[in-house]
Amino acid sequence: KISDRLSYSKRIFIVFALLCSVSIFLVAGTYYVRLYADNRKLAQNEFKDISTRTAQALEREIDMMDMISCQIFGNKKIQKELFDATENRKKGVNYFEQNPDARNNVQEALWSFNSPRKVVANLSIIYPDMFIGLLEIPGVEEVNRIWNQGLYENWDGYYKILPTHEDPFAISEKKDRVTVSLLRKMNLSFYSQKDVGVIEVQQSYEKIEEICSQNYDRNNMQLYVVDEDGNIVYPYEDTKKTREMKRVTETFGSQQCDVIVSSKEISGIGMQHQLSNAPWKVIVFQRDKDFFGPIFRSVRWILIFGGGMLIFMILAVFFATKRIMNPIVTLRKTVENSDTGEALDFSDLKTEIDEIDLLQRAFTKMVKHIRE
């Protein structure tokens, strides 16, 4: 056996090194399991807090937009002007372009809902062939084009939230034209129950961005807001992230809790929160490499420190055993170089204790021989 060929000190040395190595890996493994559980729990709590706070802020914003649409819906001045516009409506002609007094009355009422500070980006009332809003009035052809695109379909019975889109009626630069719209059907409740158009309450993307960009970028956590079709509401116009988040939302399904997302293309941990007043979901997501990064760094430092201590202890044991064995080596050389004429047989020795006994007997004989 190999162990029989090793000296006693070498056996102690190897056993000590193996025990130290096993201890270090056991400590690192235990620490990894404990740290993973703690990080998972911390991530769950943090994801829940971030997604809940963001969803509540978005819900308040949507409630405010809907409150304004209800106020517009019930305004008597607007109702009267819309009734007159409906009664005197001519196909292909924007009534409010031909009647500036009526336009001013409606715009004055609209401004009252958006002052003294700018609460929302824009307010508009849209007919299939008429339009009036706080901004400039586009041509009837443009209104018809937008209307016929089916932009205002799929009503839920009360109001509809459109995902982020570019306002076709805005006059500002492209980066400032991105809006989120709340649409509510409007009828002349004071005159008839006939639907006469759509109230559009627009909120700028900057407001959505302000809500969604607060206090979530920790260890590369990513926050998304998606609509019922999986389209990205925030961040806007990022094709790569849109494709990625559609895969994430498919993995989440309808679950309202934390989910380990794992596939060939994307893997990580995340949580989603469904808004109570809109078909939007807030998703907080973190990839595996970012979630496991702090854990691996901690374990790596444990292994580095433990490896350094192991090397130090191995060297200490090595030199200590070497120092202890030096007298035995000296004794062996002394006995072997003596003139007693007796050859020592070390073949049957199993341990260094046996060797020491043999050397001691030989040394005693050598001393006796010298005396004689």
Predicted regions and their residues:
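Extreme N-terminal signal-anchor transmembrane helix of membrane signaling/transducer proteins, especially
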Residues: 2-45
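Cytosolic-side ends of inner-membrane transmembrane helices, especially those
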Residues: 15, 28-33, 301, 305, ...
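Extracellular/periplasmic ligand-binding regions of membrane signal-transduction receptors
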Residues: 48, 52, 59, 63-105, ...
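Extracytoplasmic/periplasmic sensor domains and loops in membrane signaling proteins
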Residues: 96-103, 107-108, 137-170, 235-261
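Solvent-exposed, extracytoplasmic
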Residues: 103-114, 198-235, 239-240
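Extracytoplasmic/periplasmic ligand-binding sensor regions of membrane-associated signaling proteins
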Residues: 115-122, 128-202
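Short, hydrophobic beta-strand elements of compact beta-sandwich sensory domains
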Residues: 181-184, 195-205, 262-302, 306
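Membrane-proximal alpha-helical signal-transduction linkers
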Residues: 322-346, 350, 360-363, 367
